A protein has these predicted regions:
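Phosphate-rich cofactor/ligand-interacting catalytic cores and adjacent structured alpha/beta frameworks
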Residues: 2-89, 93, 131-197
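Long, hydrophobic/aromatic-enriched structural stretches that serve as scaffold segments
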Residues: 76-132
Length: 197
């Protein structure tokens, strides 16, 4: 026989697991949708879009779709880590890195060795975990709070930005250029009826 407290604890555990799985899947689907929207954005001079391969001879629209499909489960994994993983930022980042390296390998396998999304795997994985971490602690979720939390997680593992570039430098700085000017411009154009895809 079990006590009422034991049964209550067990029910709370089951409910939390259900909630965490549902939230992780939702965040993962949102990350996948973001990748597809970014791919569909046309024109993107020099980059792969719906109309052409830009400056690339080793990849096309369908190479990117293959990459998005194979890496999609990774973002839900990152969100699960944010919801249920280590509270310590450096330990959390170590787990994200492990998942990220596997996702990179999956991407390279699906694309015949072509790097279509290495930076996006890093950035959206970190953002997925940050969004989930805010949800875990009942904190307000916004683009700004997600980016700040992502920067906090990454900075706890890599405190010095010296020598960083690309996606890692952007993460260390809280994705500042994405927040301003990019996000306000995107929102304004969407309100004005522009096709933002």
């Amino acid at each position: 026989r079990h006590t009422l407290d034991e049964l209550t604890d067990h029910v709370h555990t089951l409910l939390w697991q259900w909630y965490a799985d549902a939230q992780a899947e939702r965040i993962g689907r949102t990350a996948q949708r973001a990748m597809l929207y970014e791919l569909a954005a046309t024109p993107k001079p020099g980059l792969v879009d719906r109309r052409n391969n830009g400056a690339h001879t080793d990849m096309d629209f369908y190479t990117f779709i293959d990459s998005v499909c194979i890496t999609a489960p990774y973002f839900a994994q990152c969100a699960r880590e944010g919801l249920c993983g280590p509270a310590d930022g450096a330990a959390l980042f170590a787990r994200l890195k492990m998942h990220g390296l596997k996702a990179e390998g999956d991407m390279l396998g699906a694309t015949g060795g072509v790097n279509t999304h290495k930076g996006e795997i890093f950035s959206l994985g970190l953002i997925s975990a940050a969004w989930a971490r805010l949800t875990r602690y009942g904190a307000p979720v916004s683009a700004g709070s997600i980016c700040k939390t992502a920067a906090d997680i990454f900075s706890s593992a890599v405190p010095d930005a010296h020598g960083l570039s690309g996606a890692r430098l952007s993460a260390h700085g809280g994705f500042a250029l994405a927040l301003n000017p990019a996000l306000p411009i995107l929102r304004r154009e969407a309100q004005n009826g522009m096709d933002t895809a």
